[in-house]
């Protein structure tokens, strides 16, 4: 007679009408509780009509919430159709939905997702609202266009180097006013270095004589052809970027349509120079009307970076209850791994989050400024190294951004000197406390002349 194994108490069910979807490129597998349908696992093709039929079936059997993995971009149409049908949709991080090793199939994955979601063991990944998602899509596409344009800048520079035209040595940027005038003249057929040097802009630091010497080249038809096509492709992508700027401006106008005018006028800009690859409209004013706070007053955050931050996070940061949760989502906080009471590792997690990369770049920039954040970066860089200092400074900038967006905090830089003074006072206070613990009293040394 075989032994009857005792039943193990299962986890409590929190979402009784939950479904799980295993997303694929050709078809999607949907699993629902067996109490809702005689066929709890069904497969639907990836066509729009089939996805709509999936939504109708889920609505018919009374499913209230659905979970799916963020598999590539295949989940996006499913998410949008189900959301428009009035079903709560959750996108889970694949790192948190790993199944035990063994038999793996699409059906098992869908049932595993449904079980985890029913027991409330999954967390929803952040996804902004429809209007913010549109703004984010435009900005990400714009960055991709700029990457394509940058590749053709390299092609132009390589073609110039083949012809021994040392333009990049006499101008700071070959896509500047002087550089583009000279390149367009070469493409148009001009070969006289004296005539080309006359295109020098008055703001160019190199003299006409130096530019003349750099433009004596060895012209070859194949390299001129490459230069011509690279210039045409660069102009093409720049035109697409301008079209993208129009869409971004319209998306911001939709977001600010129902926003009242700020009570206080916008603060004076810290920098008046236009940044490279900046958008072709007043981003700072539009963002100030949208959120009521001038993010550019935070050192390290310029108008375009502020726009990127808002596009990636949205305007409502209450989804992160504290600044610690926000920095953890950005993977800028320590990732402690503890076993047996011992800290095995405290390295921050690796992430492909775009915001994290932008904030790290901002931290490197602010480290060269005479500000409190710059002094903080330099103090840490000398003690623990530049890599960790970049992460810590990026986290500080992220906390300032969170407080400005969540609580309307207006940032005012105390300056590097005040920061160093407060740091000195804090260290002295710690020394006095440590000395008192050992029964000593610290006294300030008198200056001996």
List where the protein language model places each region.
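A detector of single, family-specific signature residues
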Residues: 1-449
């Amino acid at each position: 007679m075989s032994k009857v194994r005792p039943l193990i108490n299962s986890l409590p069910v929190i979402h009784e009408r939950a479904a799980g979807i295993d997303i694929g490129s050709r078809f999607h597998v949907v699993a629902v509780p067996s109490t809702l349908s005689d066929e709890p696992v069904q497969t639907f093709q990836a066509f729009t009509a089939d996805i709509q039929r999936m939504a109708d079936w889920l609505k018919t059997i009374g499913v209230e919430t659905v979970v799916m993995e963020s598999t590539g971009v295949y989940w996006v149409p499913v998410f949008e159709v189900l959301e428009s049908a009035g079903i709560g949709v959750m996108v889970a991080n694949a790192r948190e939905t790993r199944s035990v090793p063994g038999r793996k199939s699409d059906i098992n994955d869908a049932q595993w997702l449904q079980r985890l979601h029913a027991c409330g063991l999954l967390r929803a990944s952040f996804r902004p609202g429809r209007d913010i998602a549109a703004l984010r899509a435009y900005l990400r596409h714009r960055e991709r266009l700029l990457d394509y344009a940058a590749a053709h800048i390299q092609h132009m520079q390589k073609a110039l180097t083949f012809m021994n035209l040392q333009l990049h040595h006499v101008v700071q940027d070959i896509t500047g006013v002087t550089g583009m005038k000279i390149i367009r003249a070469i493409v148009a057929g001009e070969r006289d270095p004296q005539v080309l040097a006359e295109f020098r802009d008055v703001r160019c630091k190199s003299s006409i004589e130096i530019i003349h010497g750099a433009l004596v080249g060895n012209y070859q038809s194949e390299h001129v052809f490459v230069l011509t096509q690279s210039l045409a492709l660069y102009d093409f992508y720049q035109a697409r970027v301008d079209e993208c700027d129009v869409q971004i401006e319209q998306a911001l106008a939709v977001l600010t349509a129902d926003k009242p005018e700020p009570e206080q006028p916008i603060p004076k800009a810290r920098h008046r120079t236009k940044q490279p690859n900046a958008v072709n409209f007043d981003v700072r004013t539009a963002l100030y009307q949208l959120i009521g706070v001038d993010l550019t007053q935070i050192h390290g955050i310029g108008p375009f970076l502020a726009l990127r931050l808002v596009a990636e996070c949205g305007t409502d940061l209450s989804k992160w209850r504290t600044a610690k949760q926000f920095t953890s989502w950005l993977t800028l906080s320590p990732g402690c791994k503890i076993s047996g009471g011992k800290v095995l590792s405290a390295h921050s997690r690796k992430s492909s989050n775009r915001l994290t990369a932008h904030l790290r770049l901002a931290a490197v920039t602010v480290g060269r400024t005479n500000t409190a954040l710059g002094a903080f970066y330099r103090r840490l860089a000398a003690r623990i190294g530049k890599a960790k200092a970049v992460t810590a400074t990026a986290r500080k900038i992220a906390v300032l951004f969170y407080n400005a967006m969540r609580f309307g905090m207006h940032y005012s830089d105390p300056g590097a000197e005040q920061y160093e003074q407060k740091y000195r006072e804090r260290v002295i206070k710690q020394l006095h406390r440590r000395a008192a613990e050992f029964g000593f009293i610290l006294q300030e040394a008198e200056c001996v002349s």
